[in-house]
């Protein structure tokens, strides 16, 4: 009730009430319609025409299109197109009719909410209903009564856009880094693999993973090495092994014969010799070891590489045996007058190609008589002059090898010692019959 109504007469009070009702029913300002109306997105209510009219977003939205894009208005919305794009307008100039306005009750819910069938206010998911203004490069996250535009993992916001972060600039990877849209990938150098954190690199044990080494494999940091067993050498490919021909490298590995075998070599000696740990060949003394076939009536004589069975009694008429190696010609026998009084049998062995001159045997007088003079000579068996006698003193002399000789060969030298005494007009001789065996080898 108006505050001054009580001062008016009754008829005037009635007219004032009617005028008040008429004023309330008259058209209001177009911006404030007498009924609540709602237009769809992209349209607004035109109070004059009582219709929804298109909103020109290109004029109403500041910087509707960014960068080099141009804004093209169309019914119910707008487009952002490149400036070089051609736009063909409707030839008849008729656009789609504006959607009809429909009356509805005002939204009783706060912004970002809408009523459901039970008239409860529920959150509007702007992200799923495309009611957001997030850029294509951004992610829309719905919030209670609102939404939020964020950059995906691996991106950062520069201006209005989300730009990929080059994680490789921050050296996250131990070896190599490959940048990817929104992410990155670490790679390792050959010989390494990614660790559990996918960033650091750990050494790969190629030997446990089937490295192509033929014989032996040694793992090292970031790689592996192939090695060969003793007696083999690594091939140029770095993986396979080939046998070393040790015998072809040197002729001094073995004294006699070198035989190459896979991964090794062996030394061999000729028959009659045994191999020593030093790879030298040593003569086997068959007479000492009993590995001979001499009878009881024979004597075993060993020489380099073999042995000889000789008769125990080697005395020939008119000589008689007085000991195992000595034959005596009796003075009572007339046949002994022109013969040496005794013959002593000796045996020795020398190697082939011995350096010369070489002292090989010393002759020694067993009896010394006062006033006697002894002379030594080679009586027989030195037809080629391979030996000569060098007298040392009155009672001894040395048999000398004058030239290198090659075996197998055998010499029987009669070394004579002539004893003379001018005062007594005495002359006698004795012979040392020396059998010299020359071995077939230089050892």
From Swiss-Prot:
Identify the keywords attached in UniProt to this record, alphabetized.
Basement membrane, Calcium, Disulfide bond, EGF-like domain, Extracellular matrix, Glycoprotein, Pyrrolidone carboxylic acid, Repeat, Secreted, Signal
Q: What is its main location?
A: secreted
Q: Where is this site: Cleavage?
A: 87-88, 90-93
Specify the glycosylation sites in chain numbering.
Answer: 198, 394
Residue ranges of every copy of the EGF-like domain listed in the record: 36-81, 123-163, 164-202, 203-242, 243-282, 283-328
* Result of knocking out the encoding gene: Homozygous mice for the EFEMP2 gene appear to be outwardly normal. Homozygous mice exhibit severe lung and vascular defects including emphysema, artery tortuosity, irregularity, aneurysm, rupture, and resulting hemorrhages. Mice died perinatally. Mice with conditional knockout of EFEMP2, in vascular smooth muscle, grow normally, are fertile and exhibit an arterial stiffness. Mice with conditional knockout of EFEMP2, in endothelial cell (EC) are healthy with an normal aorta.
Localization per record: Secreted, Extracellular space, Extracellular matrix; Secreted, Extracellular space, Extracellular matrix, Basement membrane
Which GO molecular-function terms appear in the entry?
calcium ion binding; heparin binding; protein homodimerization activity
Where, per the database record, does this protein carry Pyrrolidone carboxylic acid? 28
Its quaternary organisation is: Homodimer; disulfide-linked. Multimer; allows heparin binding. Monomer. Binds preferentially to p53 mutants. Interacts with FBN1 (via N-terminal domain); this interaction inhibits EFEMP2 binding to LOX and ELN. Interacts with ELN with moderate affinity; this interaction regulates ELN self-assembly maturation stage. Interacts with PCOLCE. Interacts with collagen type IV trimer (COL4A1-COL4A1-COL4A2), NID2 and moderately with COL15A1-derived endostatin. Interacts with EMILIN1; this interaction promotes the incorporation of EFEMP2 into the extracellular matrix.
Tell me what else is known: Aneurysm may be prevent with postnatal administration of ACE inhibitor and/or angiotensin II receptor blocker (ARB).
Please give the family membership noted in the entry.
Belongs to the fibulin family.
Functional description taken from the UniProt entry: Plays a crucial role in elastic fiber formation in tissue, and in the formation of ultrastructural connections between elastic laminae and smooth muscle cells in the aorta, therefore participates in terminal differentiation and maturation of smooth muscle cell (SMC) and in the mechanical properties and wall integrity maintenance of the aorta. In addition, is involved in the control of collagen fibril assembly in tissue throught proteolytic activation of LOX leading to cross- linking of collagen and elastin.
Protein's recorded name:
EGF-containing fibulin-like extracellular matrix protein 2
Gene of this entry: Efemp2
């Amino acid at each position: 009730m108006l505050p001054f109504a009580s001062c008016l007469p009754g008829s005037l009070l009635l007219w004032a009430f009617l005028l008040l009702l008429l004023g309330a029913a008259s058209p209001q300002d177009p911006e404030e319609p007498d009924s609540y109306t709602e237009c769809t997105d992209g349209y607004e209510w035109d109070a004059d025409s009582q219709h929804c009219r298109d909103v020109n977003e290109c004029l109403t939205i500041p910087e509707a299109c960014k960068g080099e894009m141009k804004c093209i208005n169309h019914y119910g919305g707008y487009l952002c197109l490149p400036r070089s794009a051609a736009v063909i307008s409707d030839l008849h100039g008729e656009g789609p009719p504006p959607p009809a306005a429909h009356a509805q009750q005002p939204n009783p819910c706060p912004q970002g909410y809408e009523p459901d069938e039970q008239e409860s206010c529920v959150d509007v998911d702007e992200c799923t209903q495309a009611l957001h203004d997030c850029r294509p490069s951004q992610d829309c996250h719905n919030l209670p009564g609102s939404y939020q535009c964020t950059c995906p993992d691996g991106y950062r916001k520069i201006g209005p856009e989300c730009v990929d972060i080059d994680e490789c600039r921050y050296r996250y990877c131990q070896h190599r880094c490959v940048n990817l849209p929104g992410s990155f990938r670490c790679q390792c150098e050959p010989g390494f693999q990614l660790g559990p954190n996918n960033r650091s690199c750990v050494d790969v044990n190629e030997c446990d993973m089937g490295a192509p080494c033929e014989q032996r494999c040694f793992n090292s940091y970031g790689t592996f090495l192939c090695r060969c067993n003793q007696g083999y050498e690594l091939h140029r490919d770095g993986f396979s092994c080939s046998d070393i021909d040790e015998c072809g490298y040197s002729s001094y590995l073995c004294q006699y014969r070198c035989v190459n075998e896979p991964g090794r070599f062996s030394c061999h000696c000729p028959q009659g010799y045994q191999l020593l740990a030093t790879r030298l060949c040593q003569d086997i003394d068959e007479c000492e070891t009993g590995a001979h076939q001499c009878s009881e009536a024979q004597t075993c004589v060993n020489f380099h590489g073999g042995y000889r069975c000789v008769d125990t009694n080697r005395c020939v008429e008119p000589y008689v045996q007085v000991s195992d190696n000595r034959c005596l010609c009796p003075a009572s026998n007339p046949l002994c007058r022109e013969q040496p009084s005794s013959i002593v049998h000796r045996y020795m062995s020398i190697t082939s190609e011995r350096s010369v001159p070489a002292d090989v045997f010393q002759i020694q007088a067993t009896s010394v008589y006062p006033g006697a003079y002894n002379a030594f000579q080679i009586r027989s068996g030195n037809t080629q002059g391979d030996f000569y006698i060098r007298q040392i003193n009155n009672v001894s002399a040395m048999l000398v090898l004058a030239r290198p000789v090659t075996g197998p060969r055998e010499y029987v030298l009669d070394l004579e010692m002539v004893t003379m005494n001018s005062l007594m007009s005495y002359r006698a001789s004795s012979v040392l019959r020396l059998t010299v065996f020359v071995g077939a080898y230089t050892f």
